[in-house]
Amino acid sequence: IPVGKDSMSMRTVWEQEGEALSNTAPLSLVISAFAPLQDIRDTLTPELKTTAGDTQLVLVDLGRGKNRLGGSALGQVFRTLEGTAPDLDSASDMLALFSLLKAARSEGILLAYHDRADGGLLTTAVEMAFAGRCGVTLDLAGAAPIEALFSEELGIVVQIGRADSERFTELANEAGLGDCTHTVAAVEANDAGRKNPRLTVLSHGETLYSASLSSLQRTWAETSYHMQK
């Protein structure tokens, strides 16, 4: 057994309408798989590339716009875990996602990759910005901000060159994922941006949020700091 898993004793406690409730997760089977890596230089990581010219972040949303918030980190912060939790509604979408990634990698158009997981799209973008030490501007367009930023639906975020955007869209359409593939952010690549990088969130052209990466990283590290004291 190469790794351990806490599902054998995982328990959660919460408060609902003044009553303390708890739930213990059922036993679950965990299968770990490994594969040889031919060349580590081809590895995709969350580190944003800042020397690739004009680039953007693209979300492939396997939740297909449902943006369910049940059980999310946002809900935990506000002590409310009600609502429908994210789920994989179509197993074929997962297979299609792997096909899309394989095709895009083979053409060399993927620069960075990260999953949308705990914390949702906002956390994904922040982690990628931390790794690349560069600014990111999220543009939510007409999406509901809270759901778009904090939903933990299955999905991935990839960095691609703007010149490759049309080709990536073609590949997504071929994989059957074109209608859930959206450009969500611009990556700051110039030197001025790297000196004082910021994370900015736009909606309908207005700034909803903006903060320096340094302040966000201090907040990010605070919990770990207190745990380690």
Residue spans for each PLM region:
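Short, solvent-exposed beta-strand edge segments and adjacent coil->beta transition regions
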Residues: 153-155
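Intein/HINT protein-splicing elements and their conserved insertion hotspots or analogous self-processing inserts
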Residues: 3-150, 165-229
